[in-house]
């Protein structure tokens, strides 16, 4: 659990997301409240529930990115789902309880990785012994083993091919599900049973693999680390992490709104909302790893609400999403900042990609302004897809260079207004063309 202050959280989010200060402040406070709750006594801690958030704003303005970056900062189990992927209980499809099951699986992976890091030193020593055994043989004298150990640590044996026996983690039936009783087995989905999990339980299989010494280390360290981990402890920690600090991001919540004058198929969407109610309010969900209480999981719902309005959500669901945050549409100036100020700016990405072909790319201020202007213009005249438009525009600008870069090794390319005009000019002048190409 992160102990960052709200100001530090917002500052961290500013590195990747431009603007949207209201949304950043709301999620920063929600995350800090997690830490505050942990400082309380046991009697009061269970009474403090998270204040769930509803983000309202057009596509491509940073709703999903804010939540994703927040989860990384919090070092918390996180899952992003689309509300439209789920169906009402009783219908064919995934029910909303699958969200929590997937969150538990994500937590298992996260906790296992963290625990592997803790035992990495021991696992490294054990892996080294296994490599020496493969090189020198099981019955080798200590003197011989020491000689191999010195060569191994000096990197002299990195290209030597050895044969190793490692745990077989493959799961050929992993995605194979068969119908079962409603409610599923061990908390699978409704009426679904995962054959892969059943056979995985039998486990213990090993496979022989031929690898170079250098390539074998990562595999062996992972194998040895897993031997040092206690599966029961991993599961227990994962369930606790989900219950106490899990974050669920539900996108496209506006797509399951039934408009007030709707009839027929639209009305069935309310079923998904009704199923979400107990999940967000607090219920116990059965999973294959054990029961999970959802009382203290933070839910962040988001939607563009172009057609439906937040008031079209079920009143009970509105009440369970008490914090409303409006995200504004992005402007040309925002696009300039996105291309220059963020740590993961597209300009830096393209410069680095071209550098692998020994082509030096430099963006001028005028070039960046031209890219931002075109993106804003097309958003206005065609369809506003926010910052995602920048991907389309830059990909189009670099289309020719990306193709010819291997033949231009050693060249220097300046992306200025002329370069942008040369690669995009015709398209931007023709609305019909930009409608289909950009």
From Swiss-Prot:
Localization (cell): Cytoplasm
Matching CDD domains: RecA-like_HslU
Entries under SMART domains matching the protein: AAA, ClpB_D2-small
One of the record's GO molecular function terms: peptidase activity
Protein residues bound to ATP: 18, 60-65, 251, 316, 388
Pfam families tied to this protein: AAA, AAA_2
One Gene Ontology term from the biological process aspect of the record: proteolysis involved in protein catabolic process
One Gene Ontology cellular component annotation held by this UniProt entry: HslUV protease complex
Main location per the UniProt record: cytoplasm
Keywords carried by this UniProt record: ATP-binding, Chaperone, Cytoplasm, Nucleotide-binding, Stress response
Sequence similarity: Belongs to the ClpX chaperone family. HslU subfamily.
Function summary: ATPase subunit of a proteasome-like degradation complex; this subunit has chaperone activity. The binding of ATP and its subsequent hydrolysis by HslU are essential for unfolding of protein substrates subsequently hydrolyzed by HslV. HslU recognizes the N-terminal part of its protein substrates and unfolds these before they are guided to HslV for hydrolysis.
NCBIfam families: hslU (TIGR00390), PRK05201.1 (NF003544)
Subunit structure: A double ring-shaped homohexamer of HslV is capped on each side by a ring-shaped HslU homohexamer. The assembly of the HslU/HslV complex is dependent on binding of ATP.
Record protein name field: ATP-dependent protease ATPase subunit HslU
Gene designation: hslU
């Amino acid at each position: 659990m992160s102990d960052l202050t709200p100001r530090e959280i917002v500052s961290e989010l500013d590195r990747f997301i431009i603007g949207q200060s209201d949304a950043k402040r709301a999620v920063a406070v929600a995350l800090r409240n997690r830490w505050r709750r942990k400082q309380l006594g046991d009697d009061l801690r269970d009474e403090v529930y998270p204040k769930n958030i509803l983000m309202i704003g057009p596509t491509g303005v940073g709703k999903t990115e804010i939540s994703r970056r927040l989860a990384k900062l919090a070092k918390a189990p996180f899952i992003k789902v689309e509300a439209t992927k789920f169906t009402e209980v009783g219908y064919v499809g995934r029910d909303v309880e699958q969200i929590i099951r997937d969150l538990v699986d994500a937590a298992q992976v996260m906790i296992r990785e963290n625990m592997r890091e803790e035992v990495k030193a021991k696992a490294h020593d054990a892996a080294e012994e296994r490599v020496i055994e493969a090189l020198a043989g099981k019955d080798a004298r200590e003197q011989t083993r020491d000689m191999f150990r010195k060569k191994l640590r000096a990197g002299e044996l990195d290209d030597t091919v050895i044969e190793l026996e490692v745990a077989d983690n493959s799961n050929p039936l992993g995605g194979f599900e068969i119908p079962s009783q409603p409610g599923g087995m061990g908390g699978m989905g409704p009426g679904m049973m995962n054959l892969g999990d059943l056979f995985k339980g039998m486990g213990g299989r090993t496979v022989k693999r031929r690898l170079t010494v250098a390539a074998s280390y990562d595999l062996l360290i992972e194998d040895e680390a897993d031997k040092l981990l206690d599966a029961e402890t991993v599961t227990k920690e994962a369930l606790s992490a989900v219950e106490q600090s899990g974050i669920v991001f539900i996108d496209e919540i506006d797509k399951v709104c039934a408009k007030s004058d709707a009839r027929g198929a639209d009305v069935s969407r309310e079923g998904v909302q009704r199923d979400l109610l107990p999940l967000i309010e607090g219920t116990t969900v059965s999973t294959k790893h054990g029961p999970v209480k959802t009382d203290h999981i933070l839910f962040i719902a988001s939607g563009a609400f172009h057609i439906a309005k937040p008031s079209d959500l079920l009143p009970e669901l509105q009440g369970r999403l008490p914090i409303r945050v409006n995200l504004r549409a992005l402007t040309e100036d925002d696009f300039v900042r996105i291309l220059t100020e963020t740590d993961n700016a597209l300009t830096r990405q393209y410069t680095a990609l071209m550098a692998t072909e020994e082509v030096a790319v430099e963006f001028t201020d005028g070039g960046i302004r031209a890219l931002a202007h075109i993106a804003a213009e097309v958003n206005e005249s065609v369809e506003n897809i926010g910052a995602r438009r920048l991907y389309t525009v830059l990909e189009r600008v670099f289309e020719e260079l990306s193709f010819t870069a291997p033949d231009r090794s050693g060249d220097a390319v300046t992306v200025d207004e002329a370069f942008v005009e040369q690669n995009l000019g015709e398209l931007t002048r023709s609305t019909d063309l930009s409608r289909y190409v950009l």
